[in-house]
Amino acid sequence: GICQLLPHTALNAATEGFKDALKAAFGDAVEIKEGNAGGDPANCATIIDGFVADNVDLILANATPSLTAAASATDTIPILGTAVTNYGIALNLDSTEDKVLGGNISGTSDLAPLDQQADMVKELFPDAKNVGLLYCTAEANSVYQIETVQGYLEGMGYTCKRYGFNDVNDLAAVTQTAADESDVIYVPTDNTAADNASTIADVVIPAGVPVIAGEEGICGGCGVATLSISYYEIGQIAGEMAVQILKGEKSVSEMAIGFDTTLDKKCNPTICEQLGLTMPEDYVAIGG
């Protein structure tokens, strides 16, 4: 059973990677049930409860609210998360980076090196002074990323200010304030931002303020550059973990959290052109 929080580019890619890994191993012998929560965590619980009632062999929880719903619903069915930034925060545990969670939960993380994303701001905008940190306050993983990146950026001499929005309803207004007060904006890996990147773009492009994004999907919608993991890849890694579990080769309880170690500097040529920016040659065009 696959529970995906909402349909946007990054999460869709993770689901596809997962399914491709299962199909490569099992062909048509695997039955996949999919549920999309439409961005509502309450729907995640309903979808997961259905999977538990059907006694599925494994659950893929795509994004943090899906994972927390699955963890609450069963302690026996193997659960693999994907597109979850920090499992410790998601599950109220101690830091779990590179660790085995134990129990019935493991998965893959979409956390990119935040220090290197801060370095990207310095590389591309060395003369900027004010960096706006735009994020959804309702997403614990976004708060974690913002706190971490702020520390790196302030250590480089930037003045940082947080611009938190509650949901899509105040996103445009908060983005406008950030654009008015910032030389450059950083947006972390954030589901609300990813699902509404065009709303951010409609503000920052006319304002002439560049966005450094935490992942490729957001960058493709409103950013100029990102250092991004591949969501397809972390989905595929989760799928390969699922194959091992379903074949009885390995227990979920002994599996460490998986990461995509292949990182690419990517840029959005369209928005760069609109803002009059030229990217260094080692930046690859998104979709190119």
Q: Where does each model-flagged region fall?
A:
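Extracytoplasmic "Venus flytrap"
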Residues: G1-K19, K33-N43, A138-S142, D190-D195
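Beta-alpha junction/loop-to-helix N-cap segments that form part of ligand/metal-binding clefts
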Residues: E34-T96, D190-G214
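Hydrophobic alpha-helical segments within soluble ligand-binding/sensing domains
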Residues: Y87-A128, I229-K250
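Hinge/cleft segment of the Venus flytrap/periplasmic-binding protein
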Residues: Q244-G288
